[in-house]
């Protein structure tokens, strides 16, 4: 006796490039059997953008419960081989009764397919854990998918001692589903273009001011920075709220290699207070760029550049301002490594602060930005694609936050971080330093570093009223953590379910094996542990990236505030430094302009910008998912309103962690 007939409709997504000339073959797979492939694109049925192609499938024997739809594209002779974006396949079993079998089953696809992909199997039904799969065929389908992904997506060592990356040599190897992000056109810095070939030093501050006036006239934050960059209170503000708010930390003990005494610093502390008392009160903060110690500096325009590894002490005064009170430019103390103080001559002290900013730029670019956000996103993406099947709830939650990172990072390694790229030809640390910095920094990153509440508490930033990054980061963390906790609880009905999930633990093992190891969980025991770990990943790929990326140009536009390279060595003695001396330390004109134009491009959101906790993927239209999204989006709107109200009262607003400005992923 033959099986029931099925009415099938194949839905092509509506985008203008979603169609294909290829033929489509379709099979239905049930718990008891499957149909042979039938060609969908016959006669008048074509896979046009937004089209619906109907086909009737007659099963020769009973299929049982319908569980999978198998699709395969075949290139049509003499026609271009175009990728096809399938929205979904809907199947209706034709039967006399009107029971559950008569309902339409929806098999979501929502991705690009290619003839080279071979057979692609679509599932019907909700996301679930492996132990909840009833059908053996669905368990096998999960396994097949992971085996295929592990052959396709492999690990590669980029730098020894740092998180590994995806093993591809070109963007085309990633396939269309990992290439969808598009760069926005950068703001046109027209007046910088003509300077990118001028291989000479800046002549004066007035020359810098001329370029700045023409190029940054619409940038209110950059103009504020230029007006206040020499002031000590602003130096402290930038440590808290600039493009690199990850370096500063409270210290209760002076580093043994910092040559300061209580008497030396007494003039810069409140009357009657000693350095020891201020340390114990938690009023002393430290910037320590030890990671730069001893690394080779770049050669740019055939000129040797120089790096320092400064230590900088800052004091939290009674007005809530964080003021620098001592700067030592190298790690090893000695007579040729003086401690600069606010009481030194104006240009001596200014130059010392510029050296700190230059060191901070190197650490910002490679560590706070590339390592902490880009490499973290890629690590999570590769592990997710390799170890969590599509049907796993954490695969669907995480992928929108990480999948763009592969295209961005592969492109960066082929351009910005490649030989003769921007880092090689314009940045003081250069390519030779890159592996040293990444491996050193990776060894220092702990799990607590990635968890915002612990990180801010450990660094003493959660108590500072002027730390707007810290305030906003905690708000964002709490909202995302609440959302992720609800998502985890939706699918893990108890802690025992977490412990029994082999796919989850293979994923965690992959991250630990190819990523960080300092204090990271080796196994999950509770739902709370899973939610915290996933929140840390999502925060790193979204909010942290927004804070360290989209702020770059604002704080670097005024070149002396953020020297990307230094052309003279750090001073070995205190002396009368002049304005001309200051200018001679700055990078050449072409170097400066090339970096500013690159930062300008990096500061633009993607064309297809998706705000934090907004999702275009069809799976998020499920009723249960939609309710969770409504809750978190309402929380984020309230945070946006609170930040807008606060910023309206500030002379220099902090906008970077306002949720509507946070991209859901590393997409630039």
Residues of each region from the PLM?
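Noncatalytic interaction/regulatory regions of large eukaryotic proteins
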Residues: 1-668
